[in-house]
Amino acid sequence: MIDTNIAIYAMEAHPALKGLAPCSPAISIISEIELLGKKGISAQEVSEVRALLEGFPVIPISDAIKEIAIDLKQKYSVKTPDAIIAATAQNLGLILITADKGFAKLNEVDVLIVEL
């Protein structure tokens, strides 16, 4: 599962992502909201984000994800969007690919930190 920042770097074809093995990642609905809800986003950027998202299953928030996110927030004091993204990865048994080193403290979640 990819974090919002990795989706942004993917759209920019960031060289740090070239070393990652090809996969068919999923993305949380939270990342979709973060990507499309950017203040001042242009029509061109919306088109680019939607084109990127077509290649990913967008995972909605289920009751199970909600409960895991609550547990993560209580245990680690993470921001709500990060807790939901991490909970989504944990619930699906996926590795969370991110550039945010803050996710490394979440012991319950398999995290791959991409160095930029």
What would you call each of these model-derived segments?
Residues 55-75:
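Acidic catalytic patch
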Residues 7, 32-35, 66, 103-104:
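A generic structural signal for short hydrophobic patches within well-formed alpha-helices
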Residues 21-24, 55-57, 90-95:
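Short active-site oxyanion
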Residues 2-5, 27-28, 78-79, 100, ...:
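Histidine- and aromatic-rich ligand-binding microenvironments
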